[in-house]
């Protein structure tokens, strides 16, 4: 399963679109986010796109409407369909976040995602202590145990890591916080592609996660918040080293 599909799986969203228009929109969207189409570029006309994807022109029109709704495209009569500036994209949209995972790592985007995580996740850990039900806290412990069991596998460890953070978000019992979990999944899956290439280093990460889990299970909100900050500080340090490594 590719990393993009892992994102949809974590979000409990079907990565296989049932609508042909959605499938086409996702393919065009991936090309926009990956930079094949750049802001200001005109994409192909309806006829060309319908031939490329072997679909009707009405399907292409519906696909374009989907991308207009996500802020990626604009349609101008007499000019064509143009890619919008990145500042107009719906960056928190589930598909847009997933499309980033299909693209080469965007180091600036990863840096910004980590900054947001540093603001959000320590509070999520605190609220999990304060508002989480016993069953939800048990899910956090289960997820952390799974990380220990999967430490020899890069791919399985990544999923266990994401499930750990998802369990904390959901234990916060804050609807707004839960609505932002897609952002965290994208940040996790994107950054881990760079920082978690050697399974032998998973042991270092497990210790940070174990300390967070212990604090939450003990419902020690101050300690949980501080330990999550330490966990993210370590992750941010490793990510920064990768970001600052010259591209070959």
Regions from the language model: what does each represent?
Residues 53, 172-173, 243:
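A broad structural signal for alpha-helix termini and local helix breaks/kinks
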Residues 113-194, 205-209, 213-214, 223-238:
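Conserved amphipathic alpha-helical segments that form helical-bundle/coiled-coil interaction surfaces
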Residues 16, 61, 132, 157-161, ...:
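Juxtamembrane/interface motifs at transmembrane-helix termini
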């Amino acid at each position: 399963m590719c990393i993009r599909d892992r994102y949809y799986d974590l979000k409990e969203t079907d990565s296989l679109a049932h609508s042909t228009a959605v499938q086409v929109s996702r393919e065009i969207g991936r090309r926009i986010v990956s930079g094949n189409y750049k802001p200001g570029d005109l994409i192909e006309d309806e006829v060309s796109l319908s031939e490329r994807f072997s679909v009707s022109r009405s399907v292409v029109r519906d696909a374009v409407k989907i991308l207009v709704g996500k802020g990626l495209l604009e349609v101008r009569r007499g000019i064509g369909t143009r890619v919008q500036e990145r500042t107009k994209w719906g960056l928190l949209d589930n598909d847009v976040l997933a499309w980033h995972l299909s693209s080469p790592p965007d180091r600036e985007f990863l840096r910004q995602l980590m900054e947001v995580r540093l603001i959000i996740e320590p509070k999520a850990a605190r609220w999990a202590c304060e508002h989480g039900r016993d069953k939800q806290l048990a899910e956090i412990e289960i997820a952390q145990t799974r990380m220990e069991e999967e430490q020899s596998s890069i791919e399985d460890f990544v999923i266990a890591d994401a499930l750990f953070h998802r369990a904390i978000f959901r234990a916060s019992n804050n609807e707004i916080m839960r609505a932002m979990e897609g952002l965290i999944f994208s940040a996790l899956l994107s950054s881990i592609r760079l920082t978690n290439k050697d399974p032998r280093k998973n042991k270092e990460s497990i210790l940070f996660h174990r300390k967070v889990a212990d604090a939450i299970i003990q419902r020690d909100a101050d300690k949980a918040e501080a330990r999550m900050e330490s966990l993210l500080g370590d992750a941010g340090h490793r990510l920064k080293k990768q970001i600052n490594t010259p591209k070959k």
